[in-house]
Every structure is written in C-alpha cells, then in structure tokens.
UniProtKB/Swiss-Prot annotation:
Binding site for L-homocysteine: I430, G431, S432, E483, D598
UniProt KW Ribosomal protein keyword: no
Name of this protein: 5-methyltetrahydropteroyltriglutamate--homocysteine methyltransferase
NCBIfam families in alphabetical order: met_syn_B12ind, PRK05222.1
Known EC number: 2.1.1.14
C-alpha cells in the first residue's frame, strides 16, 4: 500500500510566499530575489513531504498567484491587452492577476471566481486570439527537474484539458472552436516533452467532472481524452477528481485509457456506491481520497480502514490519498502553542495529514494490530464539552414568523425613503477602510496585553474620527466607521461569540497574497455581550450623516470557518443567526438606521450539483439570513454584500433574503449580472461595484461615469446605489481617497443629467 497527496499549501509555514511577493510589488526586492524565495519554499516543501513518507510527491502545485492562471500561461492563453503591455513574463503574469497602471498602459485584472465550493479564488483566463495557443511555458518542466535534483521523482500536477477549457472566457464561438483544436495539440506536445524527460506519472485534475454533466460535456471530455490518451506512450496518467463524485461519467472512465482514477470519498457522496455498483477496472489504480483536504479535524483511522477494506473487495490496486488539495487547510499545528492540548490533539493541518497518510500506510502494511491505530482511537476519548442547553432550547422555540420580515419590501421602501432622505444614486463604501501598520500594531499590542483596553479604544476612536472626516470631505452619502477594531470579518465575530476556537497561525490562501485565518466552530454558538455596538454608537455620534452598522451574516461565518462535523450545517448556522440577530436589535435600539449584514460567502457551500441546491443548502441558508433581520422595524434599512461568485442562477433566492439593499462584486465580471437582474425583475435595491478594489489602479471619472451609465441603462435609477465592489482594507489610503473622490464626482455628474 502506498500513499499520495494531490497538492500542498504553497504560502509557507509562516506565509513566506505572501511577504516575498508583496515586497516585489512594493519594489523592495528584485525579480531574482522573489524567484529564489519561491524556489527555497518549493525545496522545503518537497523535503518535508518526502520526510513524511509520502510516495507520490506532487510538483507544479506551487504558484506565485494562482494555478489556473499558471495553466493558462503555460499554454499562452493570454488576452491581447496584456500582451500589448510589452512587459516581461513575470510582470505580464502579475498584470493579469492585479491589473496594471503605468507607462506601458492601463488594464484591469482578470475576473476572479470562487474555486468550486471553496474559499479559494481562481483567475478566469481570457482568450481573444486562439491562434497563439501553444505550449510556450516551461514551469511544469522546470519544477519537475528541481525536484529531480533533490532525488525526488515527483508527480507533476496540472489542470486537465476539459476543466481548463470549461473555465476559459472565450471572445466568441469561433475563438472557442479554434481553441479546442489548439489546446489539444498543446497538451499532446506537453505529453511528448514529459516523455522526453522520462516522467513516470502526470496528474491531471478534472474537478469539473463532479458537476451535473450534460451530454455535450461528456462528448467534449471523451473527444479530448480519446485523442490525448493515444499520445501518452510511457507516461502514466492519473485522472484526479475532487469536491464530489463522478456519477455522470464513472462507467465510461472504467473503460478509458487512464492508468489511475482519483476519487473523493469525503465529499463524493456516491463515490463508494459507484465502486460498489460498477466495480473497478483491473488495469487501473484507485487513488482513494480519504484524508479530508478541506477540514481540520483528525482522521478517525477506524473509519478510514473500514472504507479501505470495503474498497479492497473491488480492487487491490489502492493508493491512499487526500480528498483534495491541502491548500484549503493551514500549514501545521506545531505553531499552535496557545490552544489547549485537549482540542489540539483533535486537529490535523496539512503537515499532520501527511503523518496520517504515513500512519494508515503503516497500519495497512502491518499484519497485527498496530499501536498507531490504538493511539489514534485514544484521541477521541474525553472530548471537551460542545453542547449548550440554552442554545438548544432557543432553537427549539423558533416559530415560522421568526423567519419573515414585515411589512413587505414595497411598503418598507416607501417608509425608508421618507425616513432616510437619501439622494438619487446614494454613494457609500462596503465597510472596511485601509488598515495601516499602526492599526495592526495597536490590535496586536492589545491582544498581547501590552496596552490597556482604554489605550486600545482611544487609538481606534481616533482612527474612526479620521475615517468619518475623510468620507465627509469626499462627499459620500452613507458612511462607515472603517472597522479598525477587526482583524477579519469572520474571525472578529468568532472571537466575540461563545463556541469558537482560534489558531495563532492557521493561515489559508484565499487568493494571490491574501490569506485568511478561519476560526474553528467547536461548540454551540451564542452571544454573551454586544460586539459592535460601542463602535457604531461612537461613529454615529461624529456625523449628521448616516453611519452604517456593520455585521457579518451567519452563512458567511459558517462558510469561512472550519465547521463542526457532529451536528448539521443547518443547526450550526441557525445558532449563529440567533447570535447576530441579538446584535442587529441592539444596533437598531441604539439609533443605527442602516445595518449591513454581509453574506460575502453565500454561494460558497452551494452544492455543485443543481439537484441538491435547495434540499441541502438554500432551504436553510436563506431562512437563516431572514432570522437575523426579521425583528427590525420597517424604517430600518437592511443591507447585505456578496463577494466574487456567480449569482445569476440564484438571484430569486437572493431576492428572497428580503434585504432592502444588496451590493455585489460585479466590476470584474463586466456587470453582466445586471441583465439577469433586469430579466427577473429583481426587487431589492442594488449596488453593483463600480470599480475593482483588488487592483491598485485608480479608476478615472470618465471610466466610472461610463460604468454608472451602463448600470442606469439596465436598472431603474431609484434602485441603484454607487459603491466600490468590496471593502477597502487591503488598499493604500492614497488609492482609496483618489478612487472615492472620482466615484463621487462621477455620481454627481450623472445626477445632474438625470
């Protein structure tokens, strides 16, 4: 029995990659220094994986920004607008990631989307010229040879041709048709080069196969691989899936020329049933994904061994594997000195998951009962308490009316118009303002008890004053307090709610250099005291203008945390919803007129198969949001915000959240969402982001005016809010002030024309 992993986290044990790239962005290091830091990290990771006793060690899973972009660049799928900048390869790569504004031109970044049902974001490759598609990159070969120099025969990992093709945004059908042929030839050439290098295994990741597949999808997949697998020669090909099961294509895969199939037995609800029904091919190896790559709890060896024994009825050719890439979990628990050992023993991050694979391999390869198995089972005895009877009783007492806000949206809109007295096209921001080094230092000093609560509060109050003043000078209509007290929109609430645990170094990559530290939902959740009330009251006291209360919604708190596995996601979410509801009512009672409840991650846990959307998710996720705000008065305006996702297919459900205003991150997706809003007669007022805050470029007044005009062409003017597409926390003040001034100027200019 051997073992394998799909991919390893690339950010480093202490986010070394993030800091190295950010230094390069700030011109504080050279290209050579950045590339050396990246290589050092790769070497460290390979040696770590090798030391842990992993047999199939991945290469080419490392990325400076995003692995989908890496695959696109490998095959020269680069839009002409980036080619025309005439930058070197690295800066062209980063121009696609972040946009570019300089002497060579001014271009926006590629659109960003959620990677399937995770909190990782990938960049959407754009193809306007299929003629240039060819194998022009060499990253996959270089990194294989780097590992080879260390004495490691690695397994290069690459996004498969079918998934890559489905993720590309093509200019038109003609481009798409030509791209199909060119991309196939490029993959064939890739196979040839890997054969020249005498590579043993290539892993092709095809997560798109876990979606509901149409007949056309299956035909396209077969068309690609029937040709491609004829060119594999000595190269062995592992078809790797994750985030679900292969129910639509599994029997066909058994008859294909793949040498191995990677199945997900964690999220693949039907993976085991498929093997039981159809068996497994004698000429193939089964890479069994049984170590959870998306959650942080210790593997129960009894369950894993039971699964393996069942699979061995159908095949003896089994490799122990992770369910997906380990980039979705933190690096290692060895940096967690503050967590009680009773909790920590039940956590397994990426490095610990390597040990689990090693243990399972050893247990399966030994003839008698192994002490490793006994030690694992001991961990699950004396688990710390998780239940709170008061929370259970409160959930039990909920009635149908607790999930419905009255009066209707239409009636509320009239009441709010009279009460709030806002101008046409009201301007606002999403919530956070830049967090400079002194803000972070102040928070850290308070956490480390180096300063008093009074000093901490006074510092933040001064920052809030400055933030309110800046917004008033710019001329925004609805203000925010800036969120200087918050490290992260989810972690902050988790820290102030009972039932959460926190790591010191549990960083996970969200996109590029952005990392998040998800809290752990350990027990029943409740609010023991107000969380944001004092900050909101203070901010509102500084201005005659409305200052929004800012909260994170229950679904986002759940989706951006590591969830419990002992109760349903529905129950966990409703517990959080009741806690946030208490905060909403406190804010309203304190005179806060607009309360924003962000559901940035609403789409994240949406099942990948449409048939499961309602029963497994939307039927409880939408009511949980309703539960948060159903108790407020008609005159209180409820806002929500949603991040990078595709929303067009769940807009009716979003409308059913019954918020008064919703802001979307729509700027990177070219405002295409507006057509759908118009088509379904979306009732909620909307603020489609008018510029992309994930890029350092400052949009001009003309550019913003054009965007606002586009929005006005699609939606009634009374329904529109003007705002950036996300919070401003990661930007510099000079960019923010310049961009917001242009936003207000453009809005005023348009108002005069209406």
């Amino acid at each position: 029995m051997k073992n394998s992993i799909i991919s390893y986290p690339r950010i480093g044990a202490n986010r070394e990659l993030k800091f190295a790239i950010e230094k390069y962005f700030k011109n504080q290091s050279s290209k050579e220094e950045l590339l050396k830091s990246a290589k050092d990290l790769r070497i460290r990771h390979w040696q770590e994986i090798q030391k842990a006793g992993i047999d199939f060690i991945p290469s080419n899973d490392f990325s400076l920004y995003d692995n989908v972009l890496d695959a696109a660049v490998l095959f020269n799928i680069v839009h002409t607008k980036y080619k025309n900048l005439n930058l070197d390869a690295l800066d062209e790569y980063f121009a696609q990631s972040r946009g570019y504004q300089g002497e060579n031109g001014d271009v926006t970044a590629l659109a960003m989307k959620k990677w399937f049902n995770t909190n990782y974001h990938y960049l959407v490759p754009e193809c306007d010229n299929a003629d240039i598609i060819a194998l022009t990159g060499d990253k996959i070969f270089k990194e294989y040879l780097e590992a080879k120099e260390l004495g490691i025969e690695s397994k290069p990992v690459l996004i498969g041709i079918f998934t890559l093709f489905k993720l590309i945004a093509f200019k038109d059908e003609k481009t798409q048709k030509l791209a199909k042929e060119k991309l196939l030839n490029a993959y064939i050439e890739l196979f040839d080069k890997l054969n020249e290098l005498k590579v043993t295994w290539l892993e092709l990741d095809e997560p798109y196969l876990v979606y509901d597949l149409s007949k056309e999808d299956i035909a396209l997949f077969e068309e690609f691989y029937q040709e491609l697998l004829n060119h594999k020669k000595d190269l062995k090909i592992l078809l790797q899936s994750y985030f679900g099961d292969l129910r639509d294509i599994y029997p066909k895969l058994l008859e294909s020329k793949f040498d191995a199939l990677g199945l997900d037995f964690i999220e693949g609800k039907q993976s085991l049933a498929l093997v039981q029904k159809y068996g497994f091919a004698k000429d193939k190896i089964l890479f069994a994904g049984l170590i959870n790559g998306k959650n942080i709890y210790t593997n129960d060896y009894a369950k894993s061994l039971k699964l393996i024994k069942e699979l061995q009825k159908y095949t003896q050719n089994i490799i122990l594997n992770t369910s997906c890439s380990l980039l979705h979990v933190p690096y290692s628990t060895e940096f967690e000195s503050k967590l009680d050992s009773n909790y920590l023993k039940l956590f397994s991050f990426a490095k610990e998951k390597l040990q689990e694979l090693k243990d399972l391999k050893e247990i399966l390869n030994s003839s008698e009962e192994n002490p490793l198995f006994r030690a694992n089972q001991e961990l699950f005895k004396n688990i710390p308490e998780r239940l709170d009877e008061k929370v259970k009783a409160r959930l039990k007492a909920l009635k149908k009316e607790d999930f419905t806000r009255t009066p209707s949206f239409k009636e509320r809109a009239l009441i709010q118009k009279e009460f709030l007295k806002l101008p046409l096209l009201p301007t606002t921001t999403i919530g956070s303002f830049p967090q400079s080094a002194d803000v972070r230092s102040n928070r850290l000093a308070f956490k480390q008890e180096k300063i008093s609560a009074q000093n901490y509060t006074e510092f933040n109050q001064q920052k809030i004053k400055e933030c309110i003043q800046i917004q008033e000078e710019i001329g925004l209509d609805v203000l925010v307090h800036g969120e200087f007290e918050r490290n992260d929109m989810v972690e902050y609430f988790g820290e102030n709610l009972k039932g959460f645990l926190f790591t010191q170094n549990g960083w996970v990559q969200s996109y590029g250099t952005r990392c998040v530290k998800p809290p752990v939902i350990w027990g029943d959740v409740s609010r023991t005291k107000p969380i944001t009330l004092a900050w909101s009251k203070f901010a509102q006291s500084l201005s005659q203008k409305i200052v929004k209360g800012m909260l994170t919604g229950p679904v986002t708190i759940l989706n951006w945390s590591f969830p419990r596995e002992d109760i349903s996601l529905k129950e966990s979410t409703e517990q959080i919803a009741l806690a946030i509801r208490d905060e909403v009512l406190d804010l309203e009672n304190a005179g806060i007129k607009i309360i924003q409840i962000d559901e940035a991650a609403l789409r994240e846990k949406l099942p990948l198969r449409k048939s499961d959307w309602h029963s497994e998710y939307l039927d409880w996720a939408i009511p949980a949001f309703n539960l948060v705000h159903s108790g407020v008065k008609a005159k209180t305006q409820i806002h929500t915000h949603m991040c990078y996702s595709e929303f067009s297919d769940i807009l009716k459900e979003i409308d059913a959240m019954d918020a008064d205003v919703i802001s979307f991150e729509a700027s990177r997706s070219n405002l295409s969402l507006l057509d759908t809003l118009k088509a379904i007669r979306f009732k909620t007022e909307v603020g489609p982001g008018v510029y992309d805050i994930h890029s350092p470029r400052v949009p001009s007044v003309e550019e913003l005016s054009l965007t606002i005009e586009k929005i006005l062409n699609k939606l009634p003017k009374e329904q529109i809010w003007i705002n950036p597409d996300c919070g401003l926390k990661t930007r510099a003040y000079e960019e923010v002030i310049a961009s917001l001034k242009n936003l207000v100027t453009a809005t005023q200019k348009i108002r005069e024309q209406l």
